[in-house]
Design a protein with these regions (language model features):
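Conserved MFS/SLC helix-loop-helix module at the cytosolic interface between two early adjacent transmembrane helices
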Residues: 63-99
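Cytoplasmic helix-loop-helix junction between adjacent transmembrane helices
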Residues: 107-146
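C-terminal transmembrane helical hairpin of 12-TM major facilitator-type secondary transporters
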Residues: 288-334
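Cytoplasmic membrane-interface "Motif A"-like loop-to-helix N-cap segments
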Residues: 74-85, 283-296
């Protein structure tokens, strides 16, 4: 077997397992939401209280994600990834055993810690292990895995809860996660991705590790902050549409629930196809900022069309599908731009920091969009989403990555 074939197989295995880990994290995130009506009745709480659980999880995840990145750079991505899978699995298992709402709230803290590790660990592994010419495909597979996790979770939780109750569904998800963690622990393809390659090279040369001041200077540099801003606005736009587009289209267009739900489904499936197309574009383009800006600008224009309230009902699903396609197609190029803003030895902390912008946007967006719907402004569900998309365009077009010499791929020259 030739060296190139061996490398391709190794890259494919790494990409596959990291994509599967991302699928698992999104699967975990959406296990509970379909069960809320059952949990609400059993514990005698309202949806606001259950929503607080979700906010607690994402707040803890956002705060912990940057710290998880530091741990990844220090101790290695594989160990941290395993910790996250086990922690999130235990949180779901304990949810099935909870006897009060306050226990659920405490368990949400553990779930947030578990959720925080996936992005910094995943991207540290991909950047360290995969040939740079395949990173577009790697990041695309990573994004597709996450979307499929969201699609599978409701089927899993509703299917098991219908037959055996909601507790059985969460316990089954937790046990499944622990079994998967045991399998991931045996995957040697991930084992030499730790610690961060840049940090290791520095140690090998006898160079001291960067101090806290240098770490903060890295995280607060212009390129990294613009990546953080992109992720925050991106999350506010897309989480707003995912969460409130059904309510927005029913209020603005008088659309039947089945039509509005079909439009959301189109958005999600368009996103999956968009990530695939975006991976191909990222693999064949060096102008990643233009790829990302174009996708978000087209998505914003289509979303403004929805905000007009002038579209016929039959077109809603098609327009939402196109919005999903163009906005999600930016993900692989977006992740390569983060790589370009990352100095050697800082992969985990930078990806952890910028991806915490997703959690920040996910925490703020429901409050804003819900407020607009409560005040009978459904057009602004789409108008605000479009404005946030345009903000991402501004972030990415003004982004100036580090010099090429500073972002040379952290892999042997033969790769």
């Amino acid at each position: 077997m030739s060296a190139s074939t061996t490398e391709l197989r190794r890259d494919a295995e790494v990409i596959g397992w990291v994509g599967f880990a991302h699928l698992l994290s999104h699967f975990f995130q959406l296990i509970l939401a379909p069960l809320f009506p059952l949990i609400k009745d059993e514990f005698g709480v309202g949806y606001a209280a259950l929503g607080l659980m979700v906010s607690v999880m994402y707040t803890v995840s956002g705060v912990s994600q940057t710290m998880a990145g530091f741990v990844v750079d220090r101790y290695g991505a594989r160990r941290v990834l395993l910790f996250g899978i086990v922690a999130f699995s235990l949180a779901l298992l304990l949810t099935g055993l909870a006897t009060s709402y306050w226990m659920l709230l405490a368990i949400a803290l553990l779930a947030g810690v578990g959720n925080s590790v996936f992005h910094p660990a995943d991207f540290a592994i991909l950047n360290a292990k995969v040939n740079p010419k395949r990173l577009g495909y790697a990041f695309s597979t990573h994004g597709i895995g996450g979307n499929f996790g969201w699609l599978v979770a409701p089927v899993f939780s509703i299917g098991i809860s219908t037959a055996y109750g909601w507790r059985a569904a969460t316990i089954a998800a937790g046990v499944l996660g622990l079994l998967i963690a045991a399998v991931v622990a045996t995957r040697t393809a991930l084992s030499d991705a730790e610690p961060d390659a840049g940090a290791q090279r520095g140690k090998a040369l006898g160079a001291p590790g960067p101090g806290l001041r240098q770490d903060l200077r890295t995280l607060l540099s212009g390129p990294v902050l613009k990546c953080f801003g992109f992720f925050t606005f991106y999350s506010m736009a897309l989480i707003g549409l995912q969460t409130f587009s059904v309510s927005g289209t029913t209020a603005l267009y008088g659309a039947p629930l089945v039509t509005a739900s079909g439009a959301l489904t189109g958005f999600l499936f368009g996103g999956i196809v968009g990530i695939v197309a975006g991976g191909v574009a990222a693999a064949h383009s060096s102008r990643h900022n233009l790829v990302a800006a174009s996708g978000m600008a087209i998505g914003a224009a289509l979303t403004l069309l929805l905000a007009s309230g002038a579209l016929p009902l039959w077109s809603l699903a098609g327009v939402m599908t196109l919005i999903g396609f163009f906005t999600f197609s930016t993900q692989p190029s977006r992740d390569i731009l983060v790589r370009a803003a990352t100095p050697p030895g800082a992969t985990g902390k930078v990806y952890g920091f910028v991806y915490s912008g997703l959690d920040l946007g996910g925490s703020l967006s429901p409050l804003l969009f819900g407020w607009m719907l409560d005040r009978h402004m459904p057009q602004w569900v789409f108008g605000a989403a479009a404005l946030f998309m345009l903000a991402t365009v501004a972030m990415v077009l003004t982004l100036r990555p580090r010099r090429a010499a500073e972002v040379a791929p952290s892999c042997p020259s033969g790769r």
